[in-house]
Amino acid sequence: MDEYYAQLAEALQERLSVIADHTLRTENPVVHLERLRSASERIEKLKMALPRNADPMLVHYLERSSLNKALEFVEHRLDARGH
């Protein structure tokens, strides 16, 4: 289960990183858009594999695309388990 949350955290971090990459967006918008698309698809796949007993707040954050909040939630969960 922790492996799932580690993958989700990585995917969320990647998408947030791409969003924050203003240089890439300005210099190569096509690549920027492709990286956004790829990161979003990865998150969508992970959302579909979300455990049935997932915390309702995490589900809410992911459904609303509250990426920062979802990442904070997942990181807190992993930290609490010593990862």
What are these regions, as identified by a protein language model?
Residues 18-53:
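Amphipathic alpha-helical interaction modules
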Residues 77-78:
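Alpha-helical solenoid scaffolds that mediate protein-protein interactions
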Residues 1-26:
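Short terminal alpha-helical segments
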